[in-house]
């Protein structure tokens, strides 16, 4: 392998490693400067709330809120309202997209209270009113809040809005100016090398763990460790070629890995992610390893999932996380690749023990799902500890309103005497048990089931083709 080829290979490695930081902070920048999707521009340390008509695509079981966090001026105090038995999660994600802490129904917090969010290395005085200190690995982070909600039920939506009104973020001491935005890098850097300039600047501003900093040393020859003026203004032809080739190769590697995680027997439309912007939610519960086999990609009934896609945080696992082998990728290089895939398909998604999504394109007989037919899904007891939500999407996914989801909170849901829930998936509503009806589009579709803290060993059966009514 020649010198130029080795440099391009190294750049591909750096692209995979740095993509989560760049993609995550670019999205933070979009939210704070221009708005994100239906959310308006939202300053650091303030909340942006999705509404039922404009919620995150693919997460019809919850209402989501985002708060970009800036801890550069010191700690923040997060006030959380009592949420009772309703599923709620407050998920903390660092600049490198690592989930580093959780508060909520699973992790404690249903009674509400105050938490202190501290910047890296902070050792100041903790107020007595604070329940717990959450130290962020980076000075900029993201808080993702989800409340279980029946989006078509005005009363339930109003209850969630009332909960949101009880959310608050304020500085522990007198507020400073804080960040007006993220550093954008040297404007003299060539536009084609913008990714590398952002990676260089942001990796310096938001340094990762010690182990990752040691790993970064290998990228010295690419200019990524340079301080001050950009090395990408007029780079040598060899460096420019290596960076451009490496970016293309690294992107292809991420796309191939994303397909392996999301494919279903070689078919599909790219599926959906687990994160806030891309809409996927994910959980599990109980003890480590307590995730439904179907959520781990088991083939029963064609259900596929990625409960362990978000197991890439190896260095900073704070309150509410599970620091156990089943939830840690043993190989650091594999962790970097999973992190890049997660940033690509499900930015800011949670660990599989906090929630999980599983989907299928086929029925129990192995036939492709099609809206010309009707199907039943029997969810046996015990149900997931904190709920579930089922919806159907056309393949390929079509623009338009999000489909109606049926969840454990749907008013009028009919249960069998033993607690089993029988759901009917069809294009036309059934004559009875209308609350148990999951509408499906005409033509090919996929069914998506979200499980909020499922019990250990909970298995999702296949969809069975039903007789027309």
Please report, for each region that a protein language model flagged, where it lies by residue.
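A compositional/structural signature for long, glycine/proline-rich flexible linkers
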Residues: 1-268, 279, 284-469
């Amino acid at each position: 392998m020649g010198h130029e080829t080795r440099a391009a290979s190294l750049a591909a490695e750096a692209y995979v490693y740095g993509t989560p930081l760049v993609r995550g902070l670019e999205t933070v920048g979009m939210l704070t400067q221009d708005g994100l999707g239906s959310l308006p521009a939202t300053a650091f340390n303030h909340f942006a709330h999705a509404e039922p008509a404009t919620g995150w695509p693919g997460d019809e079981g919850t209402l989501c809120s985002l708060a970009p966090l800036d801890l550069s001026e010191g700690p923040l105090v997060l006030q959380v309202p009592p949420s009772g038995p309703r599923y709620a999660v407050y998920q903390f994600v660092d600049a490198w997209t690592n989930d580093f802490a959780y508060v909520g129904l699973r992790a404690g917090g249903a009674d509400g209270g105050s938490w202190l969010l501290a910047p890296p290395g902070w050792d100041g005085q903790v107020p007595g009113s604070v329940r717990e200190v959450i130290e962020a690995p980076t000075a900029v982070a993201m808080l993702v809040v989800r409340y279980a909600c029946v989006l078509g039920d005005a009363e339930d939506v109003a209850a969630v809005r009332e909960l949101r009104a009880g959310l608050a973020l304020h500085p522990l001491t007198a507020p400073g100016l804080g960040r007006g935005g993220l550093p954008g890098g040297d404007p003299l850097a060539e536009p084609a090398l913008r990714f590398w300039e952002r990676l260089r600047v942001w990796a310096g501003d938001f340094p990762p763990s010690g182990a990752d900093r040691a790993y970064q040393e290998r990228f010295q020859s690419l200019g990524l460790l340079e301080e001050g003026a950009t090395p990408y203004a007029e780079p040598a032809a060899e460096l420019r070629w290596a960076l451009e080739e490496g970016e293309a190769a690294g992107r292809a590697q991420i796309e191939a890995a994303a397909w392996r995680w999301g494919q279903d027997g070689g078919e599909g439309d790219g599926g959906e992610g687990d994160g806030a912007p891309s809409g996927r939610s994910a959980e599990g519960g109980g003890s480590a390893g307590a995730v439904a086999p179907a959520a781990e990609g088991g083939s029963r009934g064609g259900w596929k999932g990625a409960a362990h896609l978000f197991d890439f945080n190896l260095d900073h696992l704070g309150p509410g996380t599970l620091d156990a082998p089943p939830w840690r990728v043993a190989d650091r290089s594999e962790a970097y690749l999973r992190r890049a895939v997660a940033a690509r398909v499900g930015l800011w998604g949670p660990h599989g023990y906090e929630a999980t999504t599983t989907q299928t394109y086929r029925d129990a007989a192995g036939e492709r799902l099609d809206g010309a037919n009707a199907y039943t899904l029997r969810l046996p007891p015990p149900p997931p500890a904190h709920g579930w939500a089922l919806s159907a999407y056309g393949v390929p996914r079509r623009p338009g309103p999000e489909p109606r989801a049926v969840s454990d909170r749907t008013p009028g849901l009919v249960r069998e005497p033993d607690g089993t829930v029988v759901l009917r998936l069809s294009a036309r509503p059934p004559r009875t048990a209308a609350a148990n009806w999951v509408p499906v589009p005409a033509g090919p579709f996929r069914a998506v089931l979200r499980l909020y803290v499922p019990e250990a060993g909970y298995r999702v059966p296949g969809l069975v083709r039903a007789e027309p009514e």
